Amino acid sequence: MPRKRHPGPVSGAIALAAISLTAATPAPAQPAAAPDYSKDSSWLCLPGRSDSCSTALPTTALNPTGYGSTELSTVAKDPPLDCFYVYPTVSSDAGMNSDMSPGREEKLTTESQFARFASVCRPFAPIYRQMTLAAVAAYSAGADITQPAALAYGDVLAAWRNYIATRNEGRPFVLVGHSQGSLMVQQLIAREIEKDPALAARMKLAIIPGYNVLVPQGKLVGGTFKKTPLCSRPGQTGCVIAYSSFREKNEPPAGAMFGYADQPGMTVGCVNPALPGSRSWVKLDSYWFTRSSLQVPGGPIQWSTEGQPSTPYVRTEGLVSGKCVNDGPRGYLSIRTNHAPGDKWADHVGGEIAVLGMFLPGWGMHLADMAEAEGDLVRDAGEIGASLRSRTAAQPAH
């Protein structure tokens, strides 16, 4: 019998959230006990152990001429940088907040979005009582989710404070999140990091696609963050890479979930992950999960005319390009597929969320935010680490 196909580690869970938008508001459930982040068991990823971030991910290169070599992701030895990651909404647990027993969704999402960062930094990823898919459904039906949101952030804050106090050892760090994870990281920056100059100096980069970062139109800072700007040039530190993806010619509609500012005079920040500061089309370095059975505009993806890949991931350098667009309240990363006649690689990619056969226009290509530029994002962090290492090596011995 053929193996059962399944949604991707990130997109599958969020698609379930989309499907659940039509569900009734769930009955409240008693939250799980508060986690103790001094225990390693409260973390999905920690340096130096076997977990979701030490998994060697087999990936095949996919080029216009067809498949290339296969590689395995690696874990860096003694990198000069830490990465602290908060995963997106993936939990299918009952109630408004998840328990502290990570399921397949949390593990596969973390593996897909974050494991490759372990090639350039020490990985830290707390388990937290996140707002569940049921909470997304309840919110969409008009429910008040203030308490579930506060509970989730309280866990992330506790994990963060444990990390800084007992695990970070004064090292520079990069923050990584997506969707709900990006919301949590936003709050960490605004409430903790911006209020501590010494801590802010150690934050070298925040990578938080998939949730709106508001800035005054024409500015780089001043909305969501008071001091931390959007990145405006390659190699810049102490800044934020943020964007929400929309397919070319499909701009966010008024009132969109992502890519549309709901405050007068504001826009949604967009930083091109491949070339911060660029307002032109730039080719992206992507890692795609190839085993998804989710609906895709244009029909199922044929990754290559040579057939399906032998690995669960393919890497494409230039299959898609991204361009930051800001137009009044709208701010988004426009995504274009680059396929010429005779090319052997895919002629389209996915990313939209389908509900009952209809794609949600206000969510854009939310499911592809990380995958479409993961190679670029890892490189952004890696270049900062390399710069730190070279500066350390250049310092005279005392």
Short names for language-model regions:
Residues 23-31:
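Boundary at the C-terminal end of the N-terminal hydrophobic targeting segment
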Residues 30-68:
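N-terminal module-boundary/linker segments of secreted carbohydrate-active enzymes
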